């Protein structure tokens, strides 16, 4: 489980938004930060759910005061560290690590250069056709965190980078 209450999420793509939804559902204090402009649909969701956010940059004070920082896969920790040398790597986790703390499902994660989507989909279909309660998530449409937020599966086929 998670020891912290103050969660900062970097990025508002599929992974970041899914993490925000899960953290919010868990009753954590969520702050979302994006280096770019946040789309209106996402802003609407964040506002409706009373999730604080910032766009066009990351406030170093938020990074330092967070108990845990969930970093989207498209954000380089190395680049963040160069820009903000005072940040602590120990606080940073991926969306996959975050979501995995809140499910008891078996995870079958597929990574590599080629064939990830096909392999993850095949795993899902084999398990599903065998009668298992299985979900398919990751870089395949729905984020793992959002799936954990909305469903309870016994197995996951995950496409990860």
Predicted regions and their residues:
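Phosphate-binding loop of NTP-binding sites
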Residues: 5, 25, 60-64, 73, ...
């Amino acid at each position: 489980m998670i020891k912290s209450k103050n969660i900062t999420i970097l990025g508002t793509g599929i992974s970041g938004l899914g993490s925000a939804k899960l953290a919010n559902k868990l009753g954590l204090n969520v702050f979302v930060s994006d280096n770019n402009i946040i789309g209106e649909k996402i802003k609407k969701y964040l506002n409706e759910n009373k999730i604080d956010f910032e766009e066009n940059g990351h406030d170093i004070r938020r990074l330092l005061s967070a108990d845990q920082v969930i970093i989207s896969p498209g954000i380089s920790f190395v680049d963040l560290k160069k820009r903000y040398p005072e940040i602590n790597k120990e606080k940073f986790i991926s969306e996959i690590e975050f979501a995995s703390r809140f499910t008891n499902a078996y995870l079958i994660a597929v990574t590599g250069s080629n064939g990830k989507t096909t392999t993850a989909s095949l795993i899902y279909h084999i398990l599903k056709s065998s009668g298992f309660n299985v979900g398919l998530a990751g870089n395949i449409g729905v984020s793992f965190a959002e799936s954990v937020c909305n469903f309870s599966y016994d197995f996951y086929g995950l496409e990860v980078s």
